[in-house]
A protein has these predicted regions:
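Structural/interface elements that position substrates and couple domains in central-metabolism enzymes
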Residues: 1-272
């Protein structure tokens, strides 16, 4: 399948490299010409274990390319991923200017039906704002037919283990609302991720708003576990208890489990 990914950052490059590894034809587009030049010169603007080798292999086999040309990327991709940053504003809310700007740019070049996939971490309701940007651009060109479907497919990657997480996912969450294009989009996404569903169905289908909230809820749950264990570690120090013993005692409960129960420096990073 032909895939375009807008945003050659952490999520975009890992997604692009892994999809190319699965045999898809991938174009990654970024507005940063220096970053694209680095990628075309076999460099990487980020570090992730195994990504350099993955990219080199797929460059050599002609399955992944990099460009600054949005028109080329939109024309190429049957499925177009939006994987740009959504940094926090001063008030803590997500800054969606890059996501919405990308949607507007895609809309200017749409000529035939595309599946637009929100991969960025975005607030609930963002898909509808993306949809409006796309439709506004089509309206300006006098195009009334339905040339896109906006869906949500949040990422669940850990820095340092992103390739493993992508290639061996716990689950693949896809938010798709009922529409005239539902069957077409469902089939395309099933085909895209078919490699992961051969022995066990990993795709969880839901509506778009639920998929957007799932990503936020997962992040919040993990943050809660990490913060909770750091508080218990502080309490252990005060009371003379051994936090490692406490951790093992808590984790042995099947309702809790051992993952993300290690006290440490807290949480953060571009991929939580």
């Amino acid at each position: 399948m032909k895939i375009s990914i807008v945003g050659a950052g952490y999520v975009g490059l890992v997604t692009g490299g892994c999809l190319a590894e699965l045999g898809h034809q991938v174009i990654c587009i970024d507005s940063d010409a220096d970053k694209v030049a680095t990628l075309n010169a076999a460099g990487l603007p980020i570090y992730e274990p195994g990504l350099q080798e993955l990219m080199a292999r797929n460059r050599a086999e002609g399955r992944i390319h990099f460009t600054t040309d949005m028109a080329q990327a939109v024309e190429h991709g049957e499925v177009i991923f939006i994987a740009v940053g959504t940094p926090s504003k001063e008030d803590g809310s997500a800054d969606l200017q890059h996501v919405l700007a990308v949607a507007t740019q895609i809309g200017r070049h749409l000529k035939k039906f595309k599946v637009i996939v929100n991969k960025s971490t975005v607030p609930v309701g963002t898909a509808y704002r993306v949809q409006k940007c796309l439709q506004d651009e089509l309206n300006k060109r006098g195009i009334q037919e339905s040339l896109f479907e906006v869906i949500s497919n949040p990422e669940f990657l850990k820095e340092g283990a992103a390739i493993k997480d992508f290639m061996h996912p716990d689950r693949i969450v896809i938010g798709l609302d009922e529409s005239a294009n539902y069957k077409t989009v469902h089939q395309k996404m099933e085909l895209l991720y078919s490699s992961f569903n051969r022995h066990h169905a990993r795709t969880i289908w839901m509506d778009v708003r639920s998929a957007e909230l799932t990503k936020y809820a997962a992040n919040a749950m993990l943050a809660t576990r990490i913060s909770f264990m750091n508080e218990i570690a502080n309490l252990s120090d005060l009371l003379g208890a051994d936090i490692d013993c406490v951790r093992r005692g808590i984790g042995a409960d099947q309702r809790i489990g051992h993952d993300f129960l290690y006290a440490g420096t807290g949480y953060g990073g571009s991929c939580f």
